[in-house]
Amino acid sequence: FFFEDEKRYGDRRGFEIASLLAGDDQEGIFQNCTVWDILAGKTIAVKNLRNGEIFYISCDKLVVAAGAIPLLPVFANDDLPGVYTAAVVQKMMNRELTLLGKHVLTVGAGNIGYLTSYQLRQAGANVKAIIEALPAEGGFPVQADRVRRLGIPILTGKILLEAVPSPDGKRVSGAVIADADNFQPVPGTEKLLTGIDLINICAGLAPDNKLLRKGREIFGVDCYG
């Protein structure tokens, strides 16, 4: 990802790699479409998200590459406006040129936590801290050093307990964190962080394997993930 040989597209962005692999003849590549269901008889039901059309594709083998979905740790008031996953923060910042908050707490000291915190700082936000429940930092040291040089503290062994609502209850205004022992809060170590309007969740990813499970029911050993 960071150090691939150029022959393996290590010098290119993801959208550039997709264009290269698709080539000029894009027959058989269906954009703006999603797999609606996997049916008996090795048939894939596909829905066009733009016009609502549903069509069917029959095949002998199936490869599922559905990616992953963000993990959202459980904490009080996790549904408040101002609590977002890194994917949402990045999309709004990079594509919509919109900061979802100016005073940020990042949850998760891994490469994504470092990267989004760095980008947020470049965009003008104040990243107050990056917290990590594990006792040690994750990710590449070069990424951690990059945010540390910006003066962003990385606090290990800390867990998020609560997103504190604003007085009108309409958004985040702070957070309660505590020392962590095996992902459990240590009683009596709670600390209130004030002046936060964005909690940036970078707690990792889980495989999006629902289609893979369904595919293996229909295709058996001819379904790959």
Which positions does each model-derived feature cover?
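Residues forming the flavin
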Residues: F1-G225
